[in-house]
């Protein structure tokens, strides 16, 4: 039986183009969202386009360990490592949420070597808006 002839330029074998377009980003914004269950770190450029992101869950932490300060530190380190390779030198930090990972993520960002222009707390606070849910009785 004859062998099937393979096409020279089949789409499976040839990669069309680079999937991620790497560009030099000198300045960016680091968003840290720290809840009690997880910490999400997103790095954007000045216009708000996402460059890199990481969370405690994607770093391999499961369950209640995602809300720990060490998990937040690891997530921040992973998100910043990719953008520092792209040449980011200055950043602004926006921290949102009441979680345990706020300070640990900020410590990891400071240690990364990126110069911080300012650190802003953007946690949403109601001006007596909607009624809050009832307190848990444990």
From Swiss-Prot:
Gene Ontology BP term (one)? translation
**InterPro entries reported in the protein's UniProt record:** Ribosomal_uS11 (IPR001971), Ribosomal_uS11_bac-type (IPR019981), Ribosomal_uS11_CS (IPR018102), Ribosomal_uS11_sf (IPR036967)
Listed GO molecular functions? Answer: rRNA binding; structural constituent of ribosome
Q: Where is this region: Disordered?
A: 1-22
Gene3D superfamilies for this protein = Ribosomal protein S11 (3.30.420.80)
Which coarse location class describes where this protein primarily resides? plastid
Q: Which GO terms describe its cellular component?
A: chloroplast; ribonucleoprotein complex; ribosome
Keywords attached to this entry: Chloroplast, Plastid, Ribonucleoprotein, Ribosomal protein, RNA-binding, rRNA-binding
* Cellular localization per UniProt: Plastid, Chloroplast
Q: Does the keyword Lyase apply?
A: no
Per UniProt, subunit arrangement is: Part of the 30S ribosomal subunit.
Q: What is the similarity comment for this entry?
A: Belongs to the universal ribosomal protein uS11 family.
Protein name listed in UniProt: Small ribosomal subunit protein uS11c
The scientific name of the source species is Glycine max
User: What lineage, starting at the top, does this entry show?
Assistant: Eukaryota, Viridiplantae, Streptophyta, Embryophyta, Tracheophyta
């Amino acid at each position: 039986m004859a062998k099937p002839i393979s096409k020279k330029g089949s789409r499976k074998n040839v990669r069309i183009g680079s999937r991620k377009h790497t560009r030099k980003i000198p300045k960016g914004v680091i968003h840290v969202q720290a809840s009690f269950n997880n910490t999400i770190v997103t790095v954007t450029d000045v216009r708000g386009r996402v460059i890199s992101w990481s969370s405690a869950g994607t770093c391999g932490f499961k369950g209640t360990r995602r809300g720990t300060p060490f998990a937040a530190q690891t997530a921040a380190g992973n998100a910043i490592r990719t953008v520092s390779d792209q040449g980011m030198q200055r950043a602004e930090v926006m921290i949102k949420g009441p979680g345990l990972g706020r300070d640990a993520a900020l410590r990891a960002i400071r240690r990364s070597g990126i110069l911080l222009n300012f650190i802003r707390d953007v946690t949403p606070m109601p001006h007596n808006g909607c009624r809050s849910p009832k307190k848990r009785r444990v």
